[in-house]
């Protein structure tokens, strides 16, 4: 298949029994910054709560996460009458990887990710009905916030799940981590694993590694990962860590936060061991129309949490939806059974 045909072909959406792609969706390739092949998927609701779709929810996953991990919440949005556009960031999912070793979670520069996101919006603007609601988790939430700070005006509201505005560094001080990052980048080790820790995702267990308290959702995602190992991403590189620190610092500038004019809800896990909840609360207070909601007992991956905790996130989404696209009847409707999973693709080549 030549390069033009590869972009024209539909991108696969993977699945396993019980966790297949919601109906009404099509996976597609698009070109990111530098011509990189990236994957996105667009869904139209099969049942409406109004005479037409209420708008579009644009979903941005966190580090390591592909579109497939968000099937359940995509189904929730569809049941509420929204179109959904979800995407794989560069370096993860079925988007092009940045290093020959596909398991390395790598990044080069914040600007590449922001450019990719702008190209995503441009590519689907004609098809994605407005108003648009931005939904981003962790790394995705930070990049979403930076997009708004950069002047993006096509969104009517945003709901961010535990955004990665300031990462936790364990027993190491932030100062020592930044020093280690600078040293490794200076010595050409940007593509090496942080502390040589590959963090093989296939060795993870619920007891040791889960970022949710819901074991059934965790195991369902594990089944998806084993069915399509090309989706897997391991530990971060020094380059990714430099990117994460840079994105967090830039997103937290008070002047930048004040420029965001749309309503933004930050929904934060109380038991988060990946990001500082205090920082996210601080940021919410400095947004022009920010709201901070903390979920007691929740771990980092709120959208994968137990039903009662997920319900808090969905309530915040519904409140945002009612504000930007009010309808008389907001009762969710059932999503029809999903189709059978598609076959596994060949892995994409590294850029």
Please tell me what each predicted stretch does.
Residues 271-275:
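Acidic catalytic loop of the alpha/beta-hydrolase fold
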Residues 1-32, 36-46, 350-351:
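An N-terminal hydrophobic leader/cap segment in hydrolases
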Residues 105-125:
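Alpha/beta-hydrolase active-site loop
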Residues 144-230:
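Alpha/beta-hydrolase-fold enzymes
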Residues 67, 74-100:
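Conserved alpha/beta-hydrolase
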Residues 291, 296-351:
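Catalytic active-site module of serine/aspartate enzymes centered on a nucleophile-bearing elbow/loop
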Residues 260, 266-268:
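Short beta-strand/loop motif that positions the catalytic acidic residue
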Residues 262, 276-285:
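Short alpha-helix in the alpha/beta-hydrolase fold that links the catalytic acid
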């Amino acid at each position: 298949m030549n390069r033009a045909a590869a972009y024209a072909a539909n991108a696969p959406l993977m699945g396993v029994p019980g966790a297949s792609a919601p109906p009404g969706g099509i996976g597609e390739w698009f070109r990111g910054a530098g011509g990189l092949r990236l994957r996105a998927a667009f869904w139209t609701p099969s049942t409406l709560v109004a005479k037409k779709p209420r708008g579009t929810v644009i979903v941005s996953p966190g580090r390591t996460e592909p579109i497939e991990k968000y099937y359940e919440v995509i189904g929730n949005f569809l049941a509420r009458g929204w179109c959904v556009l979800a995407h794989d960031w560069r370096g993860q999912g079925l988007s092009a990887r940045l290093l020959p070793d596909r398991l390395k979670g790598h990044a080069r520069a914040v600007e590449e990710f922001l450019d990719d996101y702008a190209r995503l919006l441009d590519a689907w603007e004609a098809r994605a009905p407005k108003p648009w609601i931005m939904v981003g988790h962790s790394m995705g939430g930070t990049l979403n916030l930076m997009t708004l700070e950069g002047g993006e005006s096509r969104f009517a509201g945003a709901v961010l799940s535990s955004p990665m505005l300031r990462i936790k560094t364990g027993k190491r001080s932030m100062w020592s981590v930044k020093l280690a990052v600078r040293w490794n980048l200076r010595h050409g080790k940007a593509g090496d694993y942080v502390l040589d820790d590959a963090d093989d995702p296939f060795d993870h267990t619920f007891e040791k590694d889960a970022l949710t308290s819901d074991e059934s959702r965790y195991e369902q995602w594990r089944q998806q990962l084993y069915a399509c190992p090309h989706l897997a991403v391991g530990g971060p590189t020094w380059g990714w860590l430099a990117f994460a620190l840079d994105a967090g610092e830039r997103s937290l500038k008070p002047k930048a936060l004040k420029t965001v004019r749309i309503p933004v809800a930050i929904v934060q896990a109380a038991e988060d061991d990946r990001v500082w909840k205090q920082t996210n609360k601080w940021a919410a207070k400095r947004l022009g129309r920010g709201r901070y909601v903390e979920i007691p007992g929740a771990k980092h991956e709120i959208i994968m949490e137990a039903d009662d905790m997920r319900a808090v996130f969905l309530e915040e989404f519904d409140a945002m939806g009612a504000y930007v696209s009010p309808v008389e009847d907001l009762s969710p409707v059932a999503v029809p059974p999903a189709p059978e999973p598609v076959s596994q693709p060949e892995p994409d080549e590294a850029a």
